[in-house]
Regions:
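Hydrophobic anchor at the beta1->P-loop junction of P-loop NTPases
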Residues: 31
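Conserved lysine of the Walker
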Residues: 39
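Interdomain motor-coupling "hinge/lid" segment immediately C-terminal to the ATP-binding subdomain
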Residues: 134-258
């Protein structure tokens, strides 16, 4: 569940949720993503606008909700008990039921088929995909569940939150398509916003804090609280591996600051074996906390078949969270666009975050003989190389 203070932020995912709610599909929608990316707030906002009756059940905060499902004998019994629990009348055809934090009651995901088949109400589910619950959610009944993954706000969402209009974006797209120079004033404004984005990032709570206070210290406090929450999740959801998970998580900023930005297993432990701790890396990725980016033997199609699973970079899900882990002076240096400091890690993290938010699988290419490409992606049947320059190069 997320703070409702970010309810006025425009999110790209809102349109996808609207399409689902306006359709006559006999499916439920599962909205996934890391904690604090804005899932709960957006679903609540869109659901209350689209349906006269909006019923919300949080399996993390409400232990009675978990017991309700576990003791129900069938879908009709569940709906009867749900109506009693929430104290509201469930009106057929006019009620949206929002089941939040479903990782706490993962059986509800596989049972959604029967609730959908019952046909009286519409359903949206949300969860953070933490730990082993991921495989259960992904094995949900085919044909009864659509999945929408949410990410932190991308640069366009951030710019719109800061007042950039459609006209400006139309100008930028037109210049890109026609390979023309962007208006100098527009360019300056967008670069200022981009540098600000590198500090604030895309976590809705951090963005809302900046828009309200325009105080980067307060933004950093919000970011630190999110990082602390992630560490608590690590300890809670995988107690056996929590020490390794914490070490991996804490090492991400320094590993990205190294020359090749690759995650070096020996930096964790001299005898560290990937096979032994593969689940720890997988957990961070599945939780949406980290973005693994794999080296490919050759930058050729299909990239997935060229992937080297033992060679990878590990980015944080949000560039603002990464910036918050570095020394305080980096914020001012980023804002000023100083060129004598290497911001490569921050710029690459922003690029990884943007690519992931737009559905691209993340790869890079590094060969002693042929050189290095920061990212390689598949786009419309082609492999595109991406080189990220922070300004110092």
């Amino acid at each position: 569940m997320e703070n409702s203070s970010n309810s006025t932020l425009q999110r790209t995912a809102a349109k996808k949720i609207q399409v689902f709610l306006q359709s006559n599909t006999h499916k439920a929608l599962l909205v996934t993503g890391a904690r604090q990316v804005g899932k709960t707030t957006l679903i609540r906002q869109q659901g209350q606008e689209a349906f006269p009756n909006f019923v919300e059940l949080n399996f993390l905060e409400n232990t009675a909700a978990r017991q309700l499902f576990e003791t129900a004998t069938d879908s009709s019994d569940f709906l009867l008990r749900l109506s009693a629990l929430v104290g509201e009348k469930l009106v057929p055809g006019k009620t949206l039921i929002f089941l939040d934090e479903v990782q706490e009651c993962k059986e509800i995901v596989t049972a959604i088929k029967f609730l959908v088949e019952e046909g009286s109400y519409r359903y949206i589910l949300s969860g953070s995909l933490l730990g082993v619950e991921l495989k259960d959610i992904r094995s949900a009944p085919v044909g009864y569940l659509d999945v929408l993954e949410m990410f932190p706000m991308d640069i366009e969402e951030f710019a719109r939150a800061n007042g950039v209009s459609d006209r400006i974006f139309d100008h930028l797209r037109s210049c890109y398509d026609k390979k023309q120079e962007v208006d100098p004033l527009v360019h300056q404004k967008m670069m200022e916003l981009f540098r600000l984005y590198l500090i604030v990032g895309g976590m809705p709570a951090a963005v809302a804090c900046y828009l309200q206070a325009h105080n980067l210290y307060e933004v950093a406090q919000v970011q630190q609280s999110i990082l602390t929450l992630y560490k608590k999740d690590i300890a809670r959801y995988d107690p056996k591996e929590k020490l390794y998970l914490e070490d991996i998580f804490d090492l991400i900023p320094s590993e990205l600051n190294a020359k090749n930005k690759r995650f070096i297993l020996k930096d964790l432990h001299q005898d560290f074996k990937l096979s032994r701790y593969h689940n720890s890396f997988l957990w961070l990725a599945n939780a949406g906390v980290a973005l693994p980016t794999y080296n490919v033997e050759e930058p050729t199609l299909p990239l997935r078949l060229n992937r080297q699973s033992n060679l990878f970079k590990l980015f944080l899900c949000d560039v603002g969270l990464l910036a918050a882990t570095y020394a305080n002076g980096i914020q001012l240096a980023l804002l000023n666009g100083e060129k004598n400091i290497n911001f490569g890690a921050v710029f690459e993290n922003a690029a990884a975050q943007e690519l992931a938010a737009h559905g691209y699988a993340l790869y890079y290419f590094n060969s002693k003989k042929q050189g290095e490409l920061d990212f390689v992606i598949e786009h419309e049947g082609n492999v595109l190389p991406l080189e990220i320059k922070s300004g110092k190069d």
